[in-house]
């Protein structure tokens, strides 16, 4: 499986193509992505982060082997070929264990890498940029690179042991701020400088040499940088090509390397396409997909309230709010302001902290109740027009069935379509 190295080769040959990475563990988001890739006959890159999935279960309760099994089972049920499915691990390193001494955190990171590689993940993002309990802040490029090289060695050995060949593709480096959207309000963002990008590359090259890993350099396909894109709770910082032009030109000097851009969620279609042209040829998207899922569910809940007596309504919105108030750990340190501001953020924020709550059994039951209520009889077209106008057009043209599930899937696919178009190339 060489989809990524082939994509990079074509991009370097001037095709201005790219691939997007779906960063979500939600079954409906993954179904939407698999069906979209299937319809367009493209490979699909799905990534799990070190927060979501790790050897202890992460916040999803899944190990890498569990996640792979879950995705592959879904792909099989939708007749999507497994050889077109690429699984990636994002921010793999001591991220989850920053409160531990470095030696202990890195021992856990070794096991994290082993568990991802043994499970068949082929795209590995090595990120050791975070300081552990007894580390200086910030870490030097050399320490970050030495730790990444250590993990690369573990990855290569694990891959050979389990699969008899070393065919992993690596991403190095990190963006600022933290993964998953900024915590604070933003107005402008510093773009990674060419010098900083070069320093990261050279430090990693030197560290890999010291580990005897020279041969894997062509499989280091991407460097994560900050092109100047980010979102907070209510704002998006749009890509400004002029600010990233020096960075964009710098990567042209590396024949097997492109950039990976994180937090591209909510960028305009024009910005996504320009990012690809400027060699940010792996576009990560996650919160924007669960945001679209949430939009569709809120719309269906509003339709339900119009159609169904209150006493038999699912009450999805209220159940969600009650659970988030009862278990505030996923949003409390992110959302600030008075009670009303925090209420709005819980429901509507771009950072979409609500995505952590969909697996909750009470919320899942309310979701199932909502779908049952709306599946009993056809949803009136005027209500689809009112609450899901983009889907209404497709329902009227006959290309979309007006069932709750299909309306949700299609609304998510509207976002995927923007990424697909940006990545198509010339």
UniProtKB/Swiss-Prot annotation:
InterPro entries: Aldolase_TIM (IPR013785), GatZ/KbaZ-like (IPR012062), GatZ_KbaZ_carbometab (IPR050303), TagBP_ald_KbaZ (IPR023435). It holds the Pfam family GatZ_KbaZ-like. GO terms for cellular component: plasma membrane. Forms a complex with KbaY. HAMAP family: Tagatose_aldol_KbaZ. Component of the tagatose-1,6-bisphosphate aldolase KbaYZ that is required for full activity and stability of the Y subunit. Could have a chaperone-like function for the proper and stable folding of KbaY. When expressed alone, KbaZ does not show any aldolase activity. Belongs to the GatZ/KbaZ family. KbaZ subfamily. This is D-tagatose-1,6-bisphosphate aldolase subunit KbaZ. The gene is kbaZ.
